[in-house]
Design a protein with these regions (language model features):
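Anionic coordination/interaction segments
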Residues: 1-197
């Protein structure tokens, strides 16, 4: 999937710096819009980290169900709550489980001076001075993308949940280097709180 990923030092196409009508930078404004990605129309919520938490769900052609918090917590399964891939929780409980149910990614980045920095995208506390988040959902409604941009590290990490009849729930990930310089990284990526008895 091509998001117009900025490589070779080019600016990320959706990161703006202009001021809005009240003098706030665009990085401080929630900006919903339709965008075209790989020829497909998506609904984008730019700076979604500035919004109160909300929930969404991908459409399924079969009997899959999934509820995803804008903070990343997931409950999902097939048919009903008795057949979960991730344990079924009410939205009130799920709201407290962003760091313990769903995706987990740790990225160790080697700095030019040899030091290491560990970046955990989508952790509950976000440093708004260096990071911003966007959420995308395709018009068909069966794919949802979470994106975090780290300006300090010049990296973008995004992951996608999709639902299909053949493979069921599919999660894919991508990391993009926004700078012209090569970067050395190590990634630990996986899922937490799977209900293994039902897999």
């Amino acid at each position: 999937m091509i998001f117009g990923s900025a490589k070779n030092g080019k600016q990320h196409p959706w990161k703006r710096s202009a001021k809005d009508s009240v003098g706030r930078s665009a990085a401080e404004v929630v900006d919903p819009a339709y965008v075209l990605i790989d020829g497909e129309s998506w609904f984008q919520i730019e700076n979604s980290h500035l919004m109160p938490e909300f929930f969404t769900t991908p459409a399924s052609p079969d009997n899959h169900w999934m509820f995803i918090s804008s903070h990343g917590a997931v409950t999902a399964g097939r048919k009903d709550a008795e057949h979960p891939l991730f344990p079924y929780y009410s939205i009130y409980k799920l709201a407290d489980m962003a760091e313990s149910s769903g995706s987990l990614t740790l990225i160790r980045v080697q700095r030019p001076d040899g030091r290491f920095t560990v970046w955990r995208p989508f952790q509950k506390a976000i440093d708004r001075n260096t990071c911003s988040r966007n959420i995308y959902k395709n018009v068909d409604g069966n794919r949802i993308v979470f994106e975090e941009m780290n300006q300090e590290l010049s990296l973008v990490f995004r992951y996608q949940w999709s639902v299909g009849k053949q493979f069921g729930f599919v999660r894919t990930c991508e990391i993009v280097n926004l700078s012209a310089a090569p970067v050395t990284i190590s990634i630990l990526d996986g899922l937490q709180n799977l209900s293994l008895i039902h897999i």
